Amino acid sequence: MPEELKTEIEARKAEDFKMTYLLDDALYIVHGFGMQETGGYSIQVQALYLAENAIYFETDLIGPVNGTKVEKCVSYPYIVVKTERLTENVVFE
């Protein structure tokens, strides 16, 4: 991941955020879910597809399973998907 993108994610990670980043021949699609009270979260990509007029990206934040021991530390879950550079807009669903 490019350093500039890492810096941008670090600056935004406390709040829910969605962004794209272009570098050379790559498109990075990013969704951050903000501050969570514990660890144990995962992110599932529900959809990533190119339609006629846009790239669609849908993700879900999945919390810790009930009864699972989780760390009591703050976490900032986010996902970065790298794909080929495209000119279409990204629609976050």
Model-inferred region functions:
Residues 1-93:
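Exposed, flexible binding/inhibitory loops of compact, secreted disulfide-stabilized domains
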